[in-house]
Amino acid sequence: MLSPTQKRASLLASGAAVAGLLISSLAAGGVSYAADNESCRPDGLYKTPGVDVPYCSVYDTEGREKMGADHQRRVIGYFTSWRTGKNGQPAYLAKDIPWDKITHVNYAFGHVGGDNKLSVGADGPDNASTGMTWPGVAGAEMDPEFPYKGHFNQLNKFKKQHPNVRTLISVGGWAETGGYFDDNGDRVNSGGFYSMATNADGSVNQAGIDTFANSAVDFIRKYGFNGVDIDYEYPTTMKDAGNPLDWQVANARRAGLVKGYAALMKSLREKLDRAGAADGRHYLLTVAAPSSGYLLRGMETFQVQKYLDYVNIMSYDLHGAWNEYVGPNASLFDDGKDGELAAANVYGSAQYGNIGYLNTDWAYHYFRGSMPSGRINIGLPYYTRGHKNVQGGTDGLWGKAAATSCPAGAGLTKCGDGAVGIDNLWHDKDTNGQESPAGSNPMWHAKNLEKGIVGDYVTQYGFPANTTLTGTYARKYDSTLVAPWLWNAQKKVFLSTEDEQSVAAKADYVVDRGIGGTMIWELAGDYGWNAAKGQYEMGDTLTSLMYDKFKAATPYGAKKSNKALPTQAVNVGVEFTEFKLGDSNYPITPKIKITNNTATALPGGTEFQFDYGTSAPSNASDQSGFGTKVISSDHTGSNVGGLKGDFHRVSLKLPAWQSLAPGASVDLAFNYYLPVSTPSNWTVNINGTTYALAGDLARGTTTVEPGTTTPPTTPPTTEPTTPPTTPPTTPPTTPPTTPPTGCTAPAYVAGQVYNGGSLVSHKGHTWKAQWWTQNEEPGTTGEWGVWKDQGAC
């Protein structure tokens, strides 16, 4: 049985398959309206139509998250449910979290139940989340204010002491994406995310999604969470991706997984927004996203990013014992020597631009193409991965270690030779109940190995008290990769690690590039020195280091574009469609569908421009006569030591003979070679005037009809940000010539249209419209309605 601890485990099928470009939809957005909460909305974040989302409860007026004066960047820690200490192994409880050093806690994990509802299992004294207690453990006393016990009681107890820290319920993970563990610890292969979001025929299971999303709202309200983190591993079209136990249900649905994922995230965003408006607090929606170019190749352009407050990149598990290629678990940069990529001739194939895609920097730039840097967090592993019997390489790095067989249930016919025994303390078990070779250890154990120390905890993991170490675990470090490792030359064991040097470099990288922060899997892996015992144990050394790096940092980047864009936008929709599936998705020529949702014809020769991320080389082209070309690039050449900039700027034009009438669409075929997320920062030049596109959801833009400065006379056809309402066919009542005595704003007139930001006087008060409105009397719409009371006048 695969245990719950096999969370973000091997990518298994990540292999050396070369990724192809995947680009997805940029649907036309709606009119932007001036409103107090709108001033706090993060750039590019989708807003639920008709809802005054209380963004200002979480974000400042620049759209940056408010986390406390000494937290300029995020430090997000995953806190796992299973390290309770009840099995005799070291416990990691809520009291052990360095609450003053972090900004968010993601609780791992909730799951999708057989009824499609969010669950952590049945209540009871053995339920770690809601029922367990720790009598006699100092700091783990239950808070009687809460009607539940367990970790949830403890998390809320400490949140009262640290009100700036936000908690999210993380749902899924490696072991519970396609099923869940019942109260007996047996896995139920229910289908999980796969069947909840996608029907067997590949269509969207909206009923299942609605059930889950409604239950998620109920769950966070009941247990005091600040949001939901979706850890769906993985909604990709790549065959045999994810947990082998899920392949039967997942593979049958591959063609519809991306669409189901998008529907799930949109529904969650909208239901959380409505709940937040009712509760007066903005609820966060985040995901744990893959970093592998192989997996992302099957996820189109990760078009769900617009629904997310931020994305946490799982920028680890980039190398491990699922194959023979020995390399870092989570290198920051490429060095041009990655054994897995070299075997696939990635470096030798011109179309890939000499770009290596198994590193944190590549993954960051993939998401940077569609999101502000501040809505991205890079992942750091507080655990090791490694091989034994390594042949070749430099101190094991870029060597090979092939196994003669694979663990039961791995679903593979060829595997790497993973480290075992004392080099695999945090191992999972295969489906036969045997140790799964992986070289998986908490960093506190790896530090003891490095120092030649056998910690007294080894007996709690089944080792005898007189255990001795064989050979020396020499620390090695590659400054180009920003990657440390331990090399035992006698045992030929390679263990990829993290320590102060690598974490400091990654923290500097975050600060220098305006990135939102870091995400940690998992908090219990951090280390501290116990001088009394002469050994490393669970601690907060690395987390404290990041806190110190971030506390005085400059504010993170809050804008998608690095250049000024037009403040007027038009409703021209751009959608990316017709992706091939799985391994057929390379090379890729998706169709780009441009739809004119304005009332003005777009003449032949109309130019569109957009940015795509430097995760792909600057060789974009089209096959439809639109003259697509890259007109500027922030990066060229290899990415050894990191990509040097964020975007490639692309130009394409309607053919001179082809105009685009109102309501009409045109398709063109694109060609790319490495994955990018949804292209952004679109502009269109119509009759000499350059506009933004409403679908980019940029802050500070107003949607207008081309050639005017006024909003369209009819609502947009896709994703309006306000309720669609047709203006009256008869003139409104003529307003009074003077407002009521003492009031300076015009008097409210029933039937008149008011745009967001409009001020009126009514019944002795001044009122401000939060969005477009008509026939809604001030004072009757409630606290979260369209009219906000500005005080007596």
List each language-model region with its residue ranges:
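Glycan-recognition patch characteristic of GH18 chitinases/ENGases
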Residues: 35-220, 410, 414-448, 456, ...
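Extracellular low-complexity, Gly/Ser/Thr-rich intrinsically disordered linkers
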Residues: 83-84, 439-440, 444-555, 576-577, ...
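Substrate-binding surface in catalytic domains of secreted glycosidases
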Residues: 117-142, 235-435
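Tryptophan-rich substrate-binding surfaces of secreted polymer-degrading and adhesive proteins
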Residues: 705-715, 719-793
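Terminal connector regions
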Residues: 645-648, 653-707
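Secretory targeting and sorting signals
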Residues: 1-34, 713, 717-721, 725-729, ...
